[in-house]
């Protein structure tokens, strides 16, 4: 960050504030990045902020106070996040030169050792919980998609997670052809596609597994697994993420299912479940050590079934799969 680029930067995105200060706001908060950074938060959050933040905290009642402060201090140029709420933008547009600066999203791509440890813990919790669930036994007993999703969420919290990374996906039968289908109150069928994760101290995990039964399902599973494995084999520092997407996509296309691979090959994650870079054909971000990404190729045959396999990968001298959960 070049201090000459702007006089002050306004941060309102909760996870950017947590990244900088370790304070997770529960209501509206503003981080002002300048020579002496400060977090402004409501009276309701003051006690929490004082206990957790590494950046000085001040109480404020309304954003108008901040606007008046800018005027008094002679602020001329303000940097903002692209996600700045529109009501705040309207209060400052026209009075100052504004420039979008999303440098924190780039900075957050490289994880510290502490962040990697938290991610590894989240993965360990989610995988332990999955094993305790025993999905195939649940199917034999006639469990529903809803019941399995609820129990897996409970197990992750019981084992130390603060919450789920996202709404757990348990889809089966023809529902599995929808990549982000909602769980239904119906008994599990085959295949069973599961996508789940949890948070530990704010950091996310994300895993997908598919349980197949018929010969056709096994054939698709093997294609997806080949794309998954070869994409991971190609990972190393210096590689563009679009090249990884191309590897996975080309394998699936060779088998004639290119049009059935309807999402990107993966994404980065950390405090947010989806962070930069996106492992897609349009993203030319170059991999660096200590990035954490997912690899999740999938094939979805409309009204029949879908298969997705997803693992988290740490970029070291090569791609290192995080966790030890078997795929088969």
Predicted regions and their residues:
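Active-site neighborhoods and metal-handling regions in enzymes and metal-associated proteins
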Residues: 1-328
């Amino acid at each position: 960050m070049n201090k000459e680029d702007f006089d002050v930067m306004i941060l309102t995105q909760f996870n950017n504030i947590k990244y900088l200060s370790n304070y997770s706001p529960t209501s509206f908060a503003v981080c002002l990045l300048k020579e002496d950074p400060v977090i402004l938060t409501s009276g309701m959050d003051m006690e929490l902020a004082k206990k957790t933040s590494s950046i000085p905290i001040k109480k404020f009642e309304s954003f108008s106070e901040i606007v008046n402060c800018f005027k008094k201090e002679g602020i001329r140029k303000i940097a903002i996040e692209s996600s700045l709420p529109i009501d705040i933008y309207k209060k400052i547009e026209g009075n100052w030169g504004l420039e979008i600066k999303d440098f924190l999203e780039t900075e957050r791509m490289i994880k510290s050792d502490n962040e990697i440890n938290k991610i590894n813990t989240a993965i360990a919790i989610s995988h332990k919980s999955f094993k305790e669930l025993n999905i195939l036994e649940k199917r034999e007993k006639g469990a529903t998609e809803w019941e399995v999703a609820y129990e897996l969420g409970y197990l992750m919290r019981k084992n130390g997670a603060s919450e789920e990374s996202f709404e757990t996906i348990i889809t089966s039968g023809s529902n599995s052809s929808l990549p982000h289908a909602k769980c239904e109150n119906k008994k599990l069928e085959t295949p069973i596609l599961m996508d789940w994760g949890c948070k530990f101290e704010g950091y996310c995990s994300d895993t997908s597994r598919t349980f197949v039964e018929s010969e056709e399902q096994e054939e698709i599973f093997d294609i997806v697994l080949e794309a998954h494995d070869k994409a991971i084999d190609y990972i190393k520092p210096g590689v563009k993420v679009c090249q990884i997407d191309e590897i996975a996509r080309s394998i699936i296309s060779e088998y004639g299912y290119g049009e059935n691979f309807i999402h990107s090959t993966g994404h980065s994650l950390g405090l947010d479940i989806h962070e930069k870079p996106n492992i897609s054909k349009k993203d030319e971000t170059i991999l660096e050590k200590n990035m954490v990404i997912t690899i999740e190729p999938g094939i979805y045959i409309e009204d029949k079934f879908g298969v997705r396999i997803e693992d988290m990968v740490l970029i070291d001298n090569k791609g290192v799969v995080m966790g030890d959960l078997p795929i088969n």
